């Protein structure tokens, strides 16, 4: 039986937060990835490329995302974990999905297809896996995770903002990840969507950047409607069971706490 633990993506935003609070025998990033080859691990945390480096960053450089994803897929067989926490995105799931929803079989969007490919191969090759499907990650310090947050924190000097006023966002704070995952592991469940209450672009703008409300564009039917995913396991966090891990009121307060503390 293996005893060592490994964290793949330790130098990233989520990785640094996680590994400062929990010990891992191997802290792995792209420079020392080969240290995992031929080794067995009792537990391994594995970050998808979009979670590690930012969903918007990966969308802007699909070629780099595809190269990195294919490299990870090609070396899955070189690592032998007994239990894996695979942290990926919700992009492979329908916009109204829960944990009973099957991931998309394929996508014309190469960014989404990369998420599908790694998810499919990792779950095929590894035995015990907890799949953590993060919604839109919100970071107050790192750009490239959420287009909405990036736009509100660093808006262009003038003109209407390139965001949809009624699009729904389920912003997930990186500081939650450790507690949410550790709550899931004893449950023995195969997947979790740590679903936050959906808020519109307008509501989020009003909460953290009210000075930009008059720069929101008018609504049009062609604009995206956003994410309304829920979790069948939400009752482990919150009662009553409504599909979300926190209340709408708490989500708004947390947004202000992390992104606009002067408005509290």
Regions found by a protein language model. Name each.
Residues 32-99:
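NAD(P)H-binding glycine-rich loop region in Rossmannoid oxidoreductase-like domains
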Residues 46, 83-86, 130-136, 193:
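Structural signature of the Rossmann-like NAD(P)-dependent dehydrogenase/reductase core
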Residues 2-24:
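N-terminal Rossmann NAD(P)H-binding glycine-rich loop of SDR-like oxidoreductase domains
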Residues 60-71, 92-139:
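Catalytic helix-loop patch of NAD(P)-dependent Rossmann-fold dehydrogenases
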Residues 116, 120-182:
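NAD(P)-dependent short-chain dehydrogenase/reductase
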Residues 11-13, 48-53, 90-93, 136-139, ...:
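Short, solvent-exposed loop/turn segments at secondary-structure junctions
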């Amino acid at each position: 039986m293996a005893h060592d633990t490994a964290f793949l993506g330790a130098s990233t935003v989520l990785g640094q937060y996680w590994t400062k609070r929990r010990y891992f025998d191997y802290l792995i990033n792209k420079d020392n990835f080969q240290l995992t080859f031929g080794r067995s691990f009792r537990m391994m945390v594995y970050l998808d490329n979009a979670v590690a480096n930012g969903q918007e960053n990966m969308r802007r450089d699909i070629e780099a995302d595809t190269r990195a994803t294919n490299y990870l897929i090609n070396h899955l067989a070189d690592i032998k974990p007994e239990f894996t926490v695979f942290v990926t995105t919700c992009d492979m799931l329908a916009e109204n999905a829960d944990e009973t929803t099957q991931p998309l079989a394929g996508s014309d969007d190469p960014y989404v297809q990369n998420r599908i490919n790694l998810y499919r191969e990792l779950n095929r090759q590894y035995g015990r896996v907890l799949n953590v499907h993060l919604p839109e990650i919100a970071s107050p310090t790192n750009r490239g995770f959420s287009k909405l947050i990036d736009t509100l924190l660093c808006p262009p000097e003038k003109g209407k903002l390139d965001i949809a006023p009624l699009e729904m966002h389920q912003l997930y704070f990186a500081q939650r990840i450790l507690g949410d995952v550790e709550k899931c592991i004893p449950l023995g469940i195969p997947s979790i969507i740590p679903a936050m209450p959906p808020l519109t672009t307008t509501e989020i703008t009003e909460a953290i950047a009210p000075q930009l409300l008059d720069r929101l564009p008018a609504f049009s039917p062609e604009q995206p409607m956003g994410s309304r995913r829920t979790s069948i396991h939400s009752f482990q966090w919150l009662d009553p069971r409504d599909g979300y891990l926190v209340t709408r009121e708490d989500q708004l307060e947390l947004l202000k706490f992390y992104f606009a503390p002067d408005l509290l």
